[in-house]
């Protein structure tokens, strides 16, 4: 069987296109994985509503007057429109076991 130079060129271009698609997908997946979870290395003093997973990560759903000092992302959980006494929740993800109950 005689191979045509055009056929060889088309096969090479197709192979390059497929490799480019796989390279783009690998780059996109690497970017997603690097943004996955920001883990706080600290330990909460206490947590009553602990969400522990078998991966060793946990979050605390306690709503308190103030967030724990180790908390990096403290958000308002309950707005107190008239009294001015907002309640806060720490939205950090921690590594380890849940601390004692508050």
From Swiss-Prot:
Do you know which Pfam families this protein is assigned to? Bowman-Birk_leg
Give the induction note: By wounding.
Alphabetic keyword roster: Disulfide bond, Protease inhibitor, Serine protease inhibitor, Signal
First and last residue of the signal peptide:
1-15
Domain of life according to the entry = Eukaryota
The site annotation (Reactive bond) covers 52-53
Question: By its UniProt entry, which InterPro entries does this protein fall under?
Answer: Bowman-Birk_prot_inh, Prot_inh_BBI, WIP1
Q: Does the keyword Signal apply?
A: yes
Annotated protein name in UniProt: Bowman-Birk type wound-induced proteinase inhibitor WIP1
This chain is encoded by the gene named WIP1
């Amino acid at each position: 069987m005689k191979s045509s130079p055009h056929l060889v060129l088309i096969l090479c271009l197709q192979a390059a296109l497929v490799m480019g698609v796989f390279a783009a997908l690998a780059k996109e997946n690497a970017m997603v994985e690097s943004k996955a979870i920001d883990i706080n290395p600290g330990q909460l003093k206490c947590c009553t509503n602990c969400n522990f997973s078998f991966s060793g990560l946990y979050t605390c759903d306690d709503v308190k007057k103030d967030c724990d000092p180790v908390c990096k992302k403290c958000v308002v959980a309950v707005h107190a429109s008239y009294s001015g006494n907002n309640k806060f929740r720490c939205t950090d993800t921690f590594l380890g076991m849940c601390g004692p109950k508050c």
